[in-house]
Amino acid sequence: MSVDVDCVVIGAGVVGLAIARALAQSGREVLVAEATEAIGTGTSSRNSEVIHAGIYYPAGSLKARLCVRGKHLLYSYCAERGVPYKRLGKLIVATTTEQAAQLEGIAQRARANGVDDLQFISGEDAMRLEPALRCTAALSSPSTGIVDSHALMLSFQGDAENAGAQCVFHTPLVSGRVRPEGGFELQFGGDDAMTLSCNVLINSAGLHAPALARRIDGLPASNIPKDYLCKGSYFTLSGRAPFSRLIYPVPQHAGLGVHLTLDLGGQAKFGPDTEWVETEDYTLDPARADVFYEAVRSYWPALPDDALAPGYTGIRPKISGPHEPAADFVIAGPAAHGVPGLVNLFGIESPGLTSSLALAEETLARLNG
């Protein structure tokens, strides 16, 4: 059976690039096809850039296992490759007695996930660490950090290309089919429309992964989950923040609450909130600032008026809807759908960035398993 290229990875976000890197470094011929003009233009560049510890996810879930594994891989990779990062630590803060009671459950879940470095601290001790903070109790997570996600993606791209991979842009997948003799035939649009055949197809298209899977003739529709769009807005802080750590409220449904994160330059941003939407619209409504002021002042009461400026928005690629429990990552290989050579990645929301290197490992294992 002749093919034009051995492996095609759809999507040049952080996970797609990590997978392309792993495939290329294993000796395979790899083409990365990205619909837009550059790497990381979707969810990968519209997030909090946090290296998560692995605290919140159900024990035994892919999110829990791959976040913890990915965190260790990512810190080692960034240190080795000079990708900017900081292990700042995080405080999960309770501002009511009811929330304080929830901290023990969070700590128990973290321990079940292999995260054993959380520390309970009193409100007084938390406020000694961060004098601008107001809380009744907190959990300290010393292994939480931040990373320059674009530098990370550039490094993954460089690794992949150094191992022989090729990245092409403005190349959206229009349709595809499973070939009877094995492999895939793919039709791409864009400026240079083309048809390619390949042995291996990795669908790492983020928000568009379910829609892309539906374009592949021969893949059972029952193996493609319904997708939902959950928008999150961010506001940036004018001036310097009086915090040296990330500050997270006790999590609420569908997200981790309006948290305070810092970038590598020390600039603070707040978000994301949770807004279920029907279309992929990245417009930020400045009026949402009112809700942000209220949320942030629950733990930083001295937040000045007019201190928040509209930042950006992101959309979580969810495969569970409003009022449903959060879904786990789905990495659907041949064992799941019966199509040799195909892996679909669905619902790769947070902690996808943290988990990227571990997701690549898992994808190759499911491809070959």
Swiss-Prot record:
It comes from the Bacteria. Keywords: FAD, Flavoprotein, Oxidoreductase. Its cofactor is FAD. It catalyses: (S)-2-hydroxyglutarate + A = 2-oxoglutarate + AH2. It is an enzyme of class 1 (oxidoreductase). GO terms for molecular function: (S)-2-hydroxy-acid oxidase activity; 2-hydroxyglutarate dehydrogenase activity. It holds the Pfam family DAO. InterPro entries: FAD-dep_OxRdtase, FAD/NAD-bd_sf. Its EC number is 1.1.99.2. Catalyzes the dehydrogenation of L-2-hydroxyglutarate (L2HG or(S)-2-hydroxyglutarate) to 2-oxoglutarate (alpha-ketoglutarate). Also displays some oxidase activity in vitro on L-2-hydroxyglutarate with O2 as the electron acceptor, but this activity is most likely not physiological. Belongs to the L2HGDH family. This is L-2-hydroxyglutarate dehydrogenase. It comes from Achromobacter aegrifaciens.
